[in-house]
């Protein structure tokens, strides 16, 4: 999976190669490219300050993501197997579902500061209440009695939370930000309909850097 994650770092669409081995063979033939990649890897590793931990979900034995690591959405979609070498996930929603190792799961993608489209009435209230509790709103169509609502209430899916400050920001030269993987969450409480308001319990406390913006910037 990590090789496929690298593929989506290098290419913006699926199907550029018939196999990952062919990709590596082609890239290794370009000595200049190989040297540049080695140099870039060293630079990025020296800049990396994320204190990653082992995954805490049911998928920990085969999951390529590290708890509190930072990942692009494309990388996450590879990890949850909604993107393959020949087909890229078309999802642009804030949630994505699949079944991994026979276990139904759902990935929640949260921007604390929303990038609202002009004329949109959508303003989800997603924020950290504490370092281990996260308030999250479903999509506007979800009711408690709906299949989706019931899956949240009954805990029939392994829920994984991914959070970032916002999609892009001036301090990051408007580059798209990655998501911090906060790991497995379980239901604490719920109320309301269309949307439902849910509080999730984090199995592992979120990093202080995430809590700082997730608790204070939600209403910006």
Please describe what each predicted stretch is.
Residues 6-10, 123, 178-180:
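Intrinsically disordered, low-complexity N-terminal regions enriched in serine/proline/glycine
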Residues 1-63:
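C-terminal helical accessory/scaffold domains
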